[in-house]
Every structure is written in C-alpha cells, then in structure tokens.
C-alpha cells in the first residue's frame, strides 16, 4: 500500500468519525508525537515529512470536529484521556507494529481518537454542568483556542433555588443545617455560605426580610438548645469571591415545645364534725395551753425535788464528817 493511498484513507477516516476531544491542546501529547518523529531512523526525508503531515492533519481535524459538540473539556478529563493515550502509544510501538510505519501511525492515531472520544462523552454526560440547580461558572478548556475559561451553567429550575427541607426538633435539642451540593467543589475561587433566618413559615425572597446569622466557609451550622422562638424559615446562600449568589436553599424548622406540666391534683378532705374548726393535725388552742402549763409545772416540780435531794445529801455528808471528827478527838484524849 503506497503512502498516498494510506494518507487518503486516513483523511477519509478522520472525516467520517467525529473526534470529540481536545487532543491538540495537550502539550504532553505533542511532545510524545515530536519524540516519536525524532527517533524514527532509516527513512527518507520525504517519508518523515509525510508522517509529520499525518499528525498535523490530525490536530486540525480534532480542532474542527470538537466544535460539533460543546467544544470544551475539563482538566480532569483531559488528563485521563492523555494518560491512557500515552500508555497505548508506547505499547503499540513495542507490541503491535508492522512493517509499514505509516500504517502503524494511522492505527495508533485512530485508537487514540476512540480513547479520547470515550472520555469526552463521559464528561459531556456527567461532568459538564453537573449542577441540577443554581448557577455554576465551570472552569473548562476551549478546544478551539486551547485556553481555559469559565463556562456558564444555568439550571432548568428557577434561578438559584436548590430545594426546601422541612425539619422538626423538640425544644432543647439541636438541629444541623447543611446546604452542601457536590458541584459546589467546582466553583472557582473562595466561597462562603451565608445563613439567615426569618420567623415566618413561608420563604421570603427579599433579603431585607431575613436576619443574618453567620457567614462561614463550612456548608453546615448547628443550632443548639432550640427554643420555640427559633422556628421559622432558614436560608443558605452560596456566594463566590465576587459576592455572586450561586445557590439558595431553604430550611423550614418547626420546634415542638416541652409537654406542659399537669397541675397537681388537690385532694379535698371531708368536713370535720361540728366543734372541730382546726385541721386534724393541730391541737385546739385551749388544749395546747393546758398541756404547756402542765409541762411547765412538772418541770418546776422536778427541779425542786432534785434540789431538795441534793441539799439533804450534802447535809448528811457534813454530819458524817462532824461525827468522824469528834470520834477522832476522843481517841486522842484516852491515849494521854
């Protein structure tokens, strides 16, 4: 198969199969191709020029066909496609090469096209504009200019609205508010979550109706020791470093109060018989005075008895000592 026929077949193949990729924008892939051309030995200059034309035309074809889709790719997808293509390119020249250098080059370029197409189709289906709500400026590469820029992703839902959540909690408990969405990680630059509160039960769109609570880098906040006065509508806004609101989430919080304490049942006692005006546990006034007087008399009487007993005991002791003294005197006289 002559070189012109191979080249014509390659151009027809590239035109019939759309290559949805930005292969020509990856500098590493360009280096791979340049290194390949510089290491080819034993061919004529004309053949080397033809190989260079095959690669250059592939770049042109990639650029033109990428416009048929979105025309953009993100850094992660480009890295995955490049890594797989590099591996296949090296393996091809070690294991699958034939006697025709031109045919081998066409084969590996076509294989690279399928690899790149596979990765880009996944990106278009899952990675491009993943936000189902809100506003996202996604960083992607333009496959025509090979320059990075911000791709505007508008959701089909009303502007910025990203859902409403109904929460219930008992008074004194805590509740967690979290408005994080997976696509928030794709926002370029610094972001902040703005939480505010409105006491009403319905969502209010005007900023002036909301009381600012906290501005934080974290997507969630914790409300501790809830009281009934804290129920209402909570709003979470994600803002970028320019202050542009990108998503808006509402939380309707209902706080259930503590169960009311039942009043203690008062037991009504039956009426006392006639003549008893006081409670059963109190003595009548006259009886109380009588008992008090009686106790006083008994106390005084007991005290007098004790005093008299002590007085007589002391008197007997003194008389006993007197008798002992006289007896001792008589004994001394008799002795003399």
UniProtKB/Swiss-Prot annotation:
SUPFAM superfamilies, alphabetized: Immunoglobulin (SSF48726)
Q: What is the effect of changing residue 103 to A?
A: Loss of interaction with bncr
Q: Name one GO biological process term.
A: fusion of sperm to egg plasma membrane involved in single fertilization
The segment(s) forming the Ig-like C2-type domain are: 158-247
Instruction: State the tissue distribution.
Output: Expressed in sperm.
| InterPro entries (alphabetical) | Ig-like_dom, Ig-like_dom_sf, Ig-like_fold, Ig_sub, IZUMO, Izumo-Ig, IZUMO1
One Pfam family, please name it.
Izumo-Ig
Which cysteines are cross-linked by disulfides? 179-236
Q: Where in the cell is it found?
A: Cell membrane; Cytoplasmic vesicle, Secretory vesicle, Acrosome membrane
State whether keyword GTP-binding applies. Answer: no
Signal peptide region: 1-16
| A GO cellular component entry from the record | plasma membrane
GO terms of molecular function = protein binding involved in heterotypic cell-cell adhesion; signaling receptor binding
Question: According to Swiss-Prot or TrEMBL, what is its membrane topology?
Answer: Single-pass type I membrane protein
Record text on subunit structure and interactions: Forms a complex with tmem81 and spaca6 on spermatocyte cell membrane. The complex binds to oocyte protein bncr.
The UniProt record's further free-text remark is:
Izumo is the name of a Japanese shrine to marriage.
Family stated for the protein in its record:
Belongs to the Izumo family.
Q: What is this protein called?
A: Izumo sperm-egg fusion protein 1
